[in-house]
Amino acid sequence: MSTWANLGLQDSASPLMEQLIFFHDHALLILVMITVLVGYLMFMLFFNSYVNRFLLHGQLIEMIWTILPAIILLFIAMPSLRLLYLLDEINEPSITLKSIGHQWYWSYEYSDFNNVEFDSYMIPTNELANDGFRLLDVDNRIVLPMNSQIRILVTAADVIHSWTVPALGVKVDGTPGRLNQTNFFINRPGLFYGQCSEICGANHSFMPIVIESVPVNYFIKWISNSVNS
């Protein structure tokens, strides 16, 4: 989860998020190099008192500053396209979770099991435990197994919402009348927090998401208790 004064990205909990962080660092390095080069050229031109009166055009330099940016853009575009295709790929999911956005809470359904569905509301500040997180904790968490391919289907019942968990690198828009899907793979146990990332009304900022990642045997016990209850 995001911590106080954290200016960087959250710690990744999925392979896709790790790849997104690598791409961020790759693109940032290229941007820093361009900024330093342009700043150096502007500094030299500003303090240079010499002018070449016989320089009317420079074909070589024009070719360089046309071809070089194209090559740089290729170095950014290729890993970006690879990640876009990876984000859309569905790899034989073990579990399917359906998320429905409402004003202003989430509903969840475990499509592979009967009668496993619940609503998830934010816990108000006056009911929050001493060790709870303000505006982030919910009354019913999503419980998912680690080291398993998980598919999530996202839609909305009223207005556009967006189901987002930064640590997993997941952001899916929930649109009324449409069913969007993506997949993710949680590689460690823990609690992962997210929020609705599409302005959806007065209580938009009170729609948190909490995923509890557990080992597979604990998940099976939880599902068994949920089906029997």
From Swiss-Prot:
<dbReference type="Pfam" id="PF00116">
    <property type="entry name" value="COX2"/>
</dbReference>
<keyword id="KW-0496">Mitochondrion</keyword>
<dbReference type="InterPro" id="IPR036257">
    <property type="entry name" value="Cyt_c_oxidase_su2_TM_sf"/>
</dbReference>
<keyword id="KW-0479">Metal-binding</keyword>
<keyword id="KW-0186">Copper</keyword>
<dbReference type="GO" id="GO:0042773">
    <property type="term" value="P:ATP synthesis coupled electron transport"/>
</dbReference>
<comment type="subunit">
    <text>Component of the cytochrome c oxidase (complex IV, CIV), a multisubunit enzyme composed of a catalytic core of 3 subunits and several supernumerary subunits. The complex exists as a monomer or a dimer and forms supercomplexes (SCs) in the inner mitochondrial membrane with ubiquinol-cytochrome c oxidoreductase (cytochrome b-c1 complex, complex III, CIII).</text>
</comment>
<feature type="binding site">
    <location>
        <position position="200"/>
    </location>
    <ligand>
        <name>Cu cation A2</name>
    </ligand>
</feature>
<comment type="function">
    <text>Component of the cytochrome c oxidase, the last enzyme in the mitochondrial electron transport chain which drives oxidative phosphorylation. The respiratory chain contains 3 multisubunit complexes succinate dehydrogenase (complex II, CII), ubiquinol-cytochrome c oxidoreductase (cytochrome b-c1 complex, complex III, CIII) and cytochrome c oxidase (complex IV, CIV), that cooperate to transfer electrons derived from NADH and succinate to molecular oxygen, creating an electrochemical gradient over the inner membrane that drives transmembrane transport and the ATP synthase.</text>
</comment>
<dbReference type="InterPro" id="IPR002429">
    <property type="entry name" value="CcO_II-like_C"/>
</dbReference>
<feature type="binding site">
    <location>
        <position position="198"/>
    </location>
    <ligand>
        <name>Mg(2+)</name>
    </ligand>
</feature>
<feature type="transmembrane region" description="Helical">
    <location>
        <begin position="63"/>
        <end position="82"/>
    </location>
</feature>
<keyword id="KW-1278">Translocase</keyword>
<feature type="topological domain" description="Mitochondrial intermembrane">
    <location>
        <begin position="1"/>
        <end position="26"/>
    </location>
</feature>
<feature type="topological domain" description="Mitochondrial intermembrane">
    <location>
        <begin position="83"/>
        <end position="229"/>
    </location>
</feature>
<keyword id="KW-0472">Membrane</keyword>
<feature type="binding site">
    <location>
        <position position="204"/>
    </location>
    <ligand>
        <name>Cu cation A2</name>
    </ligand>
</feature>
<dbReference type="Pfam" id="PF02790">
    <property type="entry name" value="COX2_TM"/>
</dbReference>
<dbReference type="InterPro" id="IPR011759">
    <property type="entry name" value="Cyt_c_oxidase_su2_TM_dom"/>
</dbReference>
<protein>
    <recommendedName>
        <fullName>Cytochrome c oxidase subunit 2</fullName>
        <ecNumber>7.1.1.9</ecNumber>
    </recommendedName>
</protein>
<keyword id="KW-0812">Transmembrane</keyword>
<comment type="similarity">
    <text>Belongs to the cytochrome c oxidase subunit 2 family.</text>
</comment>
<feature type="binding site">
    <location>
        <position position="196"/>
    </location>
    <ligand>
        <name>Cu cation A1</name>
    </ligand>
</feature>
<keyword id="KW-0999">Mitochondrion inner membrane</keyword>
<keyword id="KW-0249">Electron transport</keyword>
<feature type="binding site">
    <location>
        <position position="196"/>
    </location>
    <ligand>
        <name>Cu cation A2</name>
    </ligand>
</feature>
<feature type="binding site">
    <location>
        <position position="207"/>
    </location>
    <ligand>
        <name>Cu cation A1</name>
    </ligand>
</feature>
<dbReference type="InterPro" id="IPR034210">
    <property type="entry name" value="CcO_II_C"/>
</dbReference>
<keyword id="KW-0460">Magnesium</keyword>
<keyword id="KW-0679">Respiratory chain</keyword>
<feature type="transmembrane region" description="Helical">
    <location>
        <begin position="27"/>
        <end position="48"/>
    </location>
</feature>
<dbReference type="InterPro" id="IPR045187">
    <property type="entry name" value="CcO_II"/>
</dbReference>
<feature type="binding site">
    <location>
        <position position="200"/>
    </location>
    <ligand>
        <name>Cu cation A1</name>
    </ligand>
</feature>
<dbReference type="InterPro" id="IPR014222">
    <property type="entry name" value="Cyt_c_oxidase_su2"/>
</dbReference>
<feature type="binding site">
    <location>
        <position position="161"/>
    </location>
    <ligand>
        <name>Cu cation A1</name>
    </ligand>
</feature>
<feature type="topological domain" description="Mitochondrial matrix">
    <location>
        <begin position="49"/>
        <end position="62"/>
    </location>
</feature>
<dbReference type="GO" id="GO:0004129">
    <property type="term" value="F:cytochrome-c oxidase activity"/>
</dbReference>
<dbReference type="InterPro" id="IPR008972">
    <property type="entry name" value="Cupredoxin"/>
</dbReference>
<keyword id="KW-1133">Transmembrane helix</keyword>
<dbReference type="GO" id="GO:0005507">
    <property type="term" value="F:copper ion binding"/>
</dbReference>
<dbReference type="GO" id="GO:0005743">
    <property type="term" value="C:mitochondrial inner membrane"/>
</dbReference>
<keyword id="KW-0813">Transport</keyword>
